[in-house]
């Protein structure tokens, strides 16, 4: 039986006149209507909608933790396979003699800025600190202690801290030390603190992004198909993608992008507002000065500023506003990192970097497929951290994937993968080791006195800076962080708006009324984030993001199968 030649033409219907000229009317209008309905539903009953979103999130955590875990493991396996398999990796994503549009520095800057730029400023300081206090190793240690106490007939006093009581029993020689017990907030918990931070921000995240990006680049530049999500499924569904099936796939990508970027911007807005409070001390920016959390008013004002700048940047295009902003925030990022390299806990951070990478690599195969019962304490930890991240990266993948494809023409699959996965992962490991490591060192040495542990997620970076410097220098450094956050927020939002326009216009870079649609989507994204903030703050945004990620997670699985089929047939 002869092998069918690959499909190299996909006729996606677009309008030839009017406001939607150049756009697929069904995808564009349906996406706008769905987003509008979500906003109306939330605003019609803010309290009730917040409760419903939270219930749906909890259902997803309870029933889809295994699915999310194995789906991401599958993405990693497929992505590494196509990169490392000799004939696959040599495949050129474009003209065999063509040269990349952007320099390696600009390309990497845009990858990093759009991919996880905002989150790293918040979580590089916060996540190692949080894991030092609570992680699977300490949870299993607690279970071991409780089992030992039960076996020895020693009752745990009501309300007593398990670890403090255990250490008291050891000191009193009434209990034999248990091998393998990891005590929270001690040096024994360092390995897990960095191992799990690297798990969440390393290969799993970037392989998910790059898998989508490679799929789209291959089918767009090597096969000549439109740069839109449905094109990546042509080996499976062929011409059927020209109709309703393809429309559904593209709509799913738009919805996932809107809610995925909402999560990222929401986190960034919280840190941005915390930074403004750290610099100015304006009371209305936070709920209370003892444990400052950004107020809804501060978040909404920050959102308005960010989205106005983002729409302006998006209108200037990838080659101008986004490129230059990406270069600026990369330079500022490395200035911030240099500050921690020079003034932070350098030797401690280097030790954590080396040990953390070793522990991460050794344990990665087991960590990516481990699933705990969501009804246990271990399962609760996994859903609130790992499953949250997997859903976030999946919801973010259509945006980052299309954006990566737009800037990666004429690179090979291996070049795309090696730079797109390894370079950002290693960069993030350095960030977490030096910024989070400095915070941990301040706590373990007693200098911080629990201040970093007690700070909110979005305030911990500024707390670390405040402990390292006098008030004047701390304000200057905090101001630089706030500016850096603003550039990351604008870069991420404007890139997302361009991606949404790309999907709606059947992969076209420029369409006649593109600027008007960019403005509409900018307003729509602002309305979604504002409505979710009113409905329950960052928790409501997280709930919506996790729900939006579910359908697109299945589409990525199909894209992976489609890419493998195409590469095998070509070879």
Model-derived features: positions:
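C-terminal membrane-solvent junction of multi-pass transporters and transport-like membrane proteins
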Residues: 20-30, 89-109, 347, 351, ...
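Hydrophobic alpha-helical segments of multi-pass membrane transport proteins
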Residues: 34, 67-84, 333-344, 427-437, ...
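Membrane-embedded translocation segments of transport machinery
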Residues: 248-411, 418-419, 423-480, 532
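Interfacial loop/helix-cap signal at membrane boundaries in integral membrane proteins
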Residues: 51, 55-59, 132, 142-201, ...
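Membrane-water interface regions at transmembrane-helix termini and the short interhelical loops
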Residues: 15-20, 45-61, 82-99, 193-200, ...
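Terminal cytosolic tails of multi-pass membrane transporters
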Residues: 1-23, 84-93, 152, 410, ...
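Helix-loop-helix module between adjacent transmembrane segments
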Residues: 19-43, 76-78, 116-120, 151-159, ...
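N-terminal alpha-helical transmembrane segments of multi-pass membrane transport
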Residues: 2-173, 315, 338, 549, ...
């Amino acid at each position: 039986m002869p092998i069918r030649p690959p499909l190299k033409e996909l006729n996606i219907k677009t309008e030839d006149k009017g406001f939607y000229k150049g756009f697929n009317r069904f995808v564009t209008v349906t996406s706008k209507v769905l987003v509008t309905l979500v906003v109306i539903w939330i605003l019609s009953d803010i309290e009730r909608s917040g409760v419903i979103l939270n219930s749906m999130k909890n259902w997803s955590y309870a029933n889809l933790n295994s699915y999310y875990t194995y789906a991401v493991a599958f993405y990693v396996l497929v992505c590494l396979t196509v990169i490392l398999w000799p004939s696959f990796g040599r495949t050129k994503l474009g003209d065999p003699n063509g040269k990349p549009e952007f320099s390696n520095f600009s390309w990497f800057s845009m990858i990093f800025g759009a991919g996880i730029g905002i989150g790293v400023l918040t979580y590089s300081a916060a996540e190692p600190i949080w894991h030092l206090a609570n992680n699977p190793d300490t949870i299993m240690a607690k279970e071991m202690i409780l089992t030992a106490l039960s076996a020895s007939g020693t009752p745990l006093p009501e309300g007593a801290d398990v670890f403090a009581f255990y250490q008291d029993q050891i000191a009193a020689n009434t209990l034999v030390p248990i091998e393998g017990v990891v005590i929270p907030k001690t040096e024994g918990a360092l390995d897990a603190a960095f191992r799990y931070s690297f798990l969440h921000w390393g290969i799993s995240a970037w392989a998910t992004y790059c898998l989508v990006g490679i799929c789209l680049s291959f089918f767009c530049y090597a096969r000549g198909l439109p740069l839109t999500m449905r094109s990546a499924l042509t080996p499976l569904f062929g011409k059927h993608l020209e109709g309703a099936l393809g429309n559904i796939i593209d709509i799913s990508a738009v919805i996932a992008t809107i809610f995925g970027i909402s999560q990222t911007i929401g986190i960034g807005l919280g840190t941005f507002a915390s930074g403004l409070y750290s610099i100015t001390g304006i009371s209305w920016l936070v709920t209370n000065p003892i444990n400052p959390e950004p107020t809804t008013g501060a978040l909404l004002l920050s959102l308005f500023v960010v989205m106005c700048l983002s729409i302006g940047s998006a209108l200037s295009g990838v080659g101008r506003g986004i490129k230059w902003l990406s270069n600026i925030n990369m330079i500022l990022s490395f200035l911030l990192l240099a500050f921690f390299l020079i003034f932070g806990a350098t030797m401690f951070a280097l030790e954590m970097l080396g040990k953390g990478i070793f522990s991460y690599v050794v344990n990665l195969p087991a960590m990516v497929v481990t699933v705990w019962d969501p009804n246990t304490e271990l399962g609760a930890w996994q859903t609130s951290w790992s499953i949250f991240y997997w859903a976030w990266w999946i919801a973010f993948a259509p945006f980052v994937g299309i954006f990566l494809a737009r800037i990666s023409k004429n690179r090979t699959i291996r070049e795309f993968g090696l730079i797109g996965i390894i370079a950002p992962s290693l960069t993030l490991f350095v960030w977490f080791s030096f910024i989070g490591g400095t915070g941990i060192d301040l706590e373990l040495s007693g200098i911080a006195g629990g201040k970093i542990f007690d700070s909110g997620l979005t305030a911990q970076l500024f707390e670390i800076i405040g402990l390292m410097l006098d008030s004047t220098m701390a304000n200057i450094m905090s101001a630089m962080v706030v500016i850096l956050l603003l550039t990351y927020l604008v870069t991420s939002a404007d890139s997302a708006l361009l991606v949404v326009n790309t999907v709606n216009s059947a992969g076209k870079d420029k369409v006649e009324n593109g600027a008007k649609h960019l403005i509409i989507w900018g307003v729509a994204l602002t309305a979604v984030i504002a409505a979710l903030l009113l409905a329950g703050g960052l928790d409501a945004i997280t709930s919506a993001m996790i729900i939006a990620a579910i359908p697109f997670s299945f589409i990525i699985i199909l894209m992976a199968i489609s890419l493998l089929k195409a590469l095998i047939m070509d070879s």
